[in-house]
Regions:
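Short, conserved "active-site rim" segments that organize catalytic pockets and cofactor/ligand binding
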Residues: 166-200
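Active-site acidic-Proline motif in GNAT/NAT acetyltransferases
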Residues: 88-94, 122-123
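Conserved G/P- and acidic residue-centered "switch" motifs that form tight phosphate/ATP-binding loops
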Residues: 64, 95, 112
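C-terminal "cap" of GNAT-fold acetyltransferases
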Residues: 4, 114-134, 138-164
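Short alpha-helical functional segments enriched in proximate histidine and acidic residues
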Residues: 107, 111, 180
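Acetyl-CoA-dependent GNAT
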Residues: 7-83, 88-90, 101-103, 107, ...
């Protein structure tokens, strides 16, 4: 079943309440007190800075269930910020986060932004890997943060194309298959020999 994406506005009360829950889940998942980012005010005012015309708040449904959210909001002249990419734990592994991040990047480009900025934590290894595959590169801090080790990333939209991302994604699939193969050998060292026998 395909992922259904929506851009939320102020009248989407039910979906906005679900996004608020996603935001709370996101904060708990990070394990970081986000008060320094005015997190409570951000949730209460949704869509807030993520609203059109300069921002976008994406909401995804997968297999009939709310699954994911992400937002882009203006930061400075020609620059926007991608924030709050969150996928429900039992929905991960289906490529939903990648689809939503791509939707946000393409929206930013269509809105005329030259650059997308974002921050994350090195411990979020899968997310960091995704961002690098999408073309993000390490950048100087664009705001002060009390969270030690915060990783700041930037994406140059003027030199970005989705086709290059798709090519890079082949490496993502290789890494996934390699990890799966290693895991199967741990579970059953003779797994691939048995599989070869069945296919013979």
């Amino acid at each position: 079943m395909p992922v259904k994406l929506r851009i939320l506005g102020a009248d989407d009360h039910v979906e906005l309440e679900q996004v608020r829950q996603f935001f709370r889940n996101y904060a708990a998942w990070l394990g970081v007190d986000l008060d320094y980012q005015n997190f409570g005010e951000e949730m209460a005012s949704l869509p807030g800075a993520y609203a059109a015309p300069a921002g976008r708040l994406f909401f995804a449904v997968f297999e009939g269930r709310p699954a994911c959210c992400v937002g882009i909001r203006p930061s400075s002249d020609g620059v926007c910020e991608m924030k709050r990419l969150y996928v429900e734990p039992d929905m991960r592994g289906n490529g939903i986060g990648r689809q939503l991040a791509l939707a946000a990047i393409k929206a930013a480009k269509a809105l005329g932004y030259r650059k997308v900025m974002m921050d994350t934590l090195p411990a979020m290894r899968i997310a960091v890997k995704l961002y690098r595959e999408l073309g993000f590169k390490e950048a100087p801090a664009y705001y002060p943060t009390p969270v030690e080790g915060t990783l700041f990333l930037a994406l140059d939209l003027e030199n970005w194309s989705e086709s290059e991302v798709k090519n890079e994604n082949l490496f993502h699939l290789f890494d996934y298959n390699l990890a799966w193969a290693r895991r199967m050998r741990q579970v059953d060292p003779g797994y691939f020999e048995k599989l070869s026998t069945l296919q013979a």
